[in-house]
Amino acid sequence: MLSGRALPTPEKCERRILMQLHEIRKALHGEAYDFLRTNPHLGSRVMLLGLGGSHAYGTDTETSDLDIRGCAALSKAEILCGESFEQVTDVATDTTIYAFPKLIHLLKECNPNTIEILGLKPEHYLYLSEAGKLLLDNRKLFLSQRAVNSFSGYATAQFRRMDNKSARIAEQPVQEMHILNSIRNAKKHFPEQFFQYPEDAIRLYIDDAVNPQMQKEIFMDISLKHYPLRDYKEMWGRMADIVKSYSRVGQGHRNQNAVTHNKLSKHMMHLIRLYLMCIDILEKGEVITYRAAEHDFLMRIRNGEYLNENQQPTAEFFEIIEQYKARVAYAAEHTDLPERPDEKKIRELVLAIHEKIVLEEQ
């Protein structure tokens, strides 16, 4: 359903971005960001600072929050003593600064939340040390076929968030189908987690409700023999938790809140953005965080063009999802990327940066 909001022209976007960057750089010197200078893990140890979230993707609006992401090196003492820290997070400013070793670990897994830090627009890096520049110059070391599983995993999680948001504002029979789909997704992993059982031993389906307060209801046909009671109790608990989670958040004000604040359409937009980034990594060997080419398409999704009159994702949007899944699968099959990153070269990069710190720090 069209929201009626006109998309800004590229020229207007560019002017707004330049003004934003000026204000953002100015804000970093303010009191709210004093922790960047006073935290013992940060200060002169910061290797890079950059934009995160919607500002980094180019999907921000005038009401978007500012997210800052970055990396900080270890001290000489921490390097020599084998010590480290995980990250520094400041909730008030939506800032996360990863310790260099943790960032390297996440980058090797092609973690979407961190690999995007390596693909910002040049002007979106708010600070870069020599070590930070060296890391960016070697960004391709971290690109591998692991992107398929990591990005697909994040996309699946985003799809479930979208599906959950959609279910919470749906009519009862539709919501029941969403619950059933979530249970079926969980049930796929039961054979790996619990004692084996025949494929047709647990059948889940929807039929006319016995509960007078419902139109449709989920039913179970179960045929298990000599099955461990504790495993069955755990399986039942997993399914019950899913039903309970929908019941907690599926009512009244929160549903309308999700629609009013465009949360559903934002989940839909980020799902497509993840597929786009994954395809670029697999096909081009590049991390492209700022989605200039698809900006208008992504913003149309965010603005609700692919929601119907009931605020549900349209059939067309689900077709788009399937198209992107197919593109990712094709790209994965034909990519030139290695199966895993070159651990030897990454180790050499880490050693070079650590050696520089040890020699320079007095």
What are these regions (language model features)?
Residues 24-29, 141, 145-155, 159-160, ...:
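Structured mid-to-C-terminal alpha-helical surface segments
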Residues 54-57, 74-76, 122, 279-280, ...:
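Short, solvent-exposed loop/turn segments at secondary-structure junctions
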Residues 17-50:
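Helical scaffold of the NTase/Pol beta-like nucleotidyltransferase catalytic core
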Residues 53, 57-93:
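Catalytic metal-binding acidic patch
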Residues 271-274, 278:
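Small-residue hotspots
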Residues 91-263, 267-270, 289, 299:
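Conserved NTP/Mg2+-binding pocket subregion across the NTase superfamily
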Residues 4-18:
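Short, Lys/Arg-enriched N-terminal segments with co-localized hydrophobic residues
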